[in-house]
Amino acid sequence: MKRAFLGILAVAALVFARPAGGEDVSGWQGAKWGMTSDQVQKVLNYPTLVADLASVCGEKCDEGAALQLDDYDLSGQHFMVRFWFTKPEMRLHAVSMYAKPGSDAGDNGGFTKIKDYLQTVHGSPQSVGLNRGRFVYTWPLPSTTVTLNSNATNQTTIVYEEKTGKAGGGS
Protein backbone atom coordinates (compact mmCIF):
# COMPACT_ATOMS: atom_id res chain seq x y z
CA MET A 1 0.00 0.00 0.00
CA LYS A 2 2.76 2.41 0.98
CA ARG A 3 4.71 1.57 -2.20
CA ALA A 4 1.62 2.20 -4.37
CA PHE A 5 1.04 5.56 -2.67
CA LEU A 6 4.66 6.58 -3.25
CA GLY A 7 4.36 5.53 -6.90
CA ILE A 8 1.21 7.64 -7.35
CA LEU A 9 2.90 10.56 -5.60
CA ALA A 10 5.96 10.28 -7.88
CA VAL A 11 3.78 10.22 -11.02
CA ALA A 12 1.78 13.21 -9.77
CA ALA A 13 4.99 15.14 -9.13
CA LEU A 14 6.14 14.46 -12.69
CA VAL A 15 2.80 15.46 -14.18
CA PHE A 16 2.49 18.72 -12.24
CA ALA A 17 6.17 19.72 -12.10
CA ARG A 18 7.12 22.81 -14.04
CA PRO A 19 9.48 21.88 -16.91
CA ALA A 20 13.10 23.06 -16.60
CA GLY A 21 12.86 24.85 -19.94
CA GLY A 22 10.67 27.92 -20.13
CA GLU A 23 11.24 29.21 -16.60
CA ASP A 24 10.85 32.96 -16.32
CA VAL A 25 14.08 34.94 -16.20
CA SER A 26 12.73 38.45 -15.32
CA GLY A 27 15.89 40.05 -16.68
CA TRP A 28 19.39 38.85 -17.52
CA GLN A 29 22.14 37.33 -15.33
CA GLY A 30 20.96 38.87 -12.05
CA ALA A 31 19.98 42.20 -13.63
CA LYS A 32 16.22 42.36 -13.13
CA TRP A 33 13.65 44.42 -15.00
CA GLY A 34 13.11 47.79 -13.37
CA MET A 35 16.62 48.13 -11.92
CA THR A 36 18.55 51.38 -12.35
CA SER A 37 21.91 51.40 -14.15
CA ASP A 38 23.70 51.65 -10.77
CA GLN A 39 21.83 48.59 -9.49
CA VAL A 40 22.63 46.64 -12.67
CA GLN A 41 26.33 47.47 -12.38
CA LYS A 42 26.35 46.27 -8.76
CA VAL A 43 24.76 42.86 -9.48
CA LEU A 44 26.86 41.99 -12.53
CA ASN A 45 30.22 40.33 -12.12
CA TYR A 46 31.47 42.02 -15.28
CA PRO A 47 32.80 45.52 -15.97
CA THR A 48 30.33 47.70 -17.88
CA LEU A 49 30.68 51.05 -19.60
CA VAL A 50 28.09 53.76 -20.16
CA ALA A 51 27.26 53.60 -23.88
CA ASP A 52 26.97 56.76 -25.98
CA LEU A 53 23.30 56.71 -27.06
CA ALA A 54 23.94 58.85 -30.14
CA SER A 55 26.38 56.29 -31.53
CA VAL A 56 24.56 53.08 -30.51
CA CYS A 57 20.95 54.15 -30.92
CA GLY A 58 20.83 57.13 -33.31
CA GLU A 59 19.26 60.55 -33.03
CA LYS A 60 15.66 59.35 -32.71
CA CYS A 61 16.41 57.10 -29.77
CA ASP A 62 13.56 56.05 -27.48
CA GLU A 63 16.00 54.84 -24.82
CA GLY A 64 16.96 56.79 -21.70
CA ALA A 65 20.40 55.22 -21.23
CA ALA A 66 22.48 52.18 -22.11
CA LEU A 67 25.26 50.22 -20.45
CA GLN A 68 27.63 48.06 -22.43
CA LEU A 69 29.51 44.88 -21.59
CA ASP A 70 32.18 44.41 -24.24
CA ASP A 71 32.73 40.65 -24.00
CA TYR A 72 30.41 37.99 -22.62
CA ASP A 73 30.92 34.28 -23.26
CA LEU A 74 27.69 32.34 -23.81
CA SER A 75 28.17 28.66 -24.48
CA GLY A 76 31.61 29.29 -26.01
CA GLN A 77 30.38 32.15 -28.20
CA HIS A 78 31.42 35.77 -27.61
CA PHE A 79 28.88 38.60 -27.47
CA MET A 80 28.80 42.33 -26.84
CA VAL A 81 25.89 43.01 -24.47
CA ARG A 82 23.83 46.20 -24.12
CA PHE A 83 21.48 46.99 -21.26
CA TRP A 84 18.69 49.38 -22.28
CA PHE A 85 16.99 51.72 -19.82
CA THR A 86 13.63 53.47 -20.26
CA LYS A 87 13.20 57.18 -20.74
CA PRO A 88 12.58 59.09 -18.44
CA GLU A 89 12.41 56.52 -15.60
CA MET A 90 15.86 55.03 -16.37
CA ARG A 91 14.78 51.48 -15.53
CA LEU A 92 16.13 48.33 -17.20
CA HIS A 93 13.68 46.97 -19.77
CA ALA A 94 15.76 45.15 -22.40
CA VAL A 95 19.10 43.44 -22.95
CA SER A 96 20.56 42.95 -26.43
CA MET A 97 23.41 40.54 -27.16
CA TYR A 98 25.34 40.94 -30.42
CA ALA A 99 27.66 38.18 -31.67
CA LYS A 100 31.16 39.58 -31.95
CA PRO A 101 32.92 39.52 -35.33
CA GLY A 102 35.12 36.47 -35.48
CA SER A 103 32.94 34.68 -32.92
CA ASP A 104 31.61 31.30 -33.95
CA ALA A 105 28.14 32.63 -33.02
CA GLY A 106 28.14 34.53 -36.31
CA ASP A 107 28.44 31.43 -38.50
CA ASN A 108 25.91 28.67 -39.10
CA GLY A 109 27.53 26.25 -36.61
CA GLY A 110 27.66 28.93 -33.93
CA PHE A 111 24.08 29.97 -34.63
CA THR A 112 22.93 26.36 -34.24
CA LYS A 113 24.88 26.04 -30.98
CA ILE A 114 23.24 29.20 -29.56
CA LYS A 115 19.77 28.09 -30.74
CA ASP A 116 20.27 24.70 -29.11
CA TYR A 117 21.50 26.37 -25.90
CA LEU A 118 18.42 28.64 -25.75
CA GLN A 119 16.14 25.65 -26.38
CA THR A 120 17.80 23.78 -23.52
CA VAL A 121 17.32 26.76 -21.18
CA HIS A 122 13.87 27.97 -22.31
CA GLY A 123 12.31 24.96 -24.04
CA SER A 124 11.03 24.90 -27.61
CA PRO A 125 10.44 28.33 -29.15
CA GLN A 126 6.81 29.35 -29.49
CA SER A 127 7.43 30.77 -32.93
CA VAL A 128 9.99 30.26 -35.65
CA GLY A 129 9.92 32.47 -38.70
CA LEU A 130 11.80 34.14 -41.48
CA ASN A 131 11.87 37.94 -41.69
CA ARG A 132 13.75 39.57 -44.58
CA GLY A 133 16.11 36.63 -44.87
CA ARG A 134 16.72 36.38 -41.13
CA PHE A 135 15.68 33.48 -38.92
CA VAL A 136 13.65 34.62 -35.89
CA TYR A 137 13.02 32.32 -32.91
CA THR A 138 10.84 33.58 -30.04
CA TRP A 139 10.41 32.32 -26.48
CA PRO A 140 7.65 34.23 -24.63
CA LEU A 141 8.14 33.72 -20.89
CA PRO A 142 5.86 35.16 -18.18
CA SER A 143 7.74 38.48 -17.78
CA THR A 144 10.29 38.31 -20.60
CA THR A 145 10.35 37.68 -24.34
CA VAL A 146 13.57 36.11 -25.62
CA THR A 147 14.25 36.52 -29.34
CA LEU A 148 17.06 34.94 -31.36
CA ASN A 149 17.60 36.68 -34.69
CA SER A 150 20.19 35.57 -37.24
CA ASN A 151 21.00 35.43 -40.91
CA ALA A 152 22.77 32.14 -39.99
CA THR A 153 26.00 33.24 -41.65
CA ASN A 154 27.57 36.25 -39.93
CA GLN A 155 25.03 38.06 -37.72
CA THR A 156 23.37 36.75 -34.57
CA THR A 157 21.48 38.78 -31.97
CA ILE A 158 19.69 37.67 -28.81
CA VAL A 159 17.24 40.10 -27.19
CA TYR A 160 15.74 39.72 -23.72
CA GLU A 161 12.85 42.16 -23.42
CA GLU A 162 10.55 42.92 -20.53
CA LYS A 163 6.93 42.15 -21.29
CA THR A 164 4.73 45.19 -20.80
CA GLY A 165 1.32 46.26 -22.00
CA LYS A 166 2.89 47.98 -24.99
CA ALA A 167 4.77 46.63 -27.99
CA GLY A 168 8.32 47.61 -28.82
CA GLY A 169 11.27 48.19 -26.55
CA GLY A 170 15.00 47.55 -26.64
CA SER A 171 17.12 48.05 -29.68
Model feature map: region roles:
Residues L6, L53, L67-L69:
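Extended hydrophobic/Leu-rich segments
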Residues A17, K32, S75-Q77:
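Generic, well-ordered alpha-helical segments
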Residues M1-I8:
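Bacterial N-terminal signal peptides that target proteins for export
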Residues Q68-P88:
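Compositionally biased P/S/T/G-rich terminal and signal peptide-adjacent segments
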Residues A20-G64, E89, A94-S171:
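Non-cytosolic coordination micro-motifs
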Residues A12, A17-P19:
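N-terminal signal peptide c-region/cleavage motif recognized by signal peptidases
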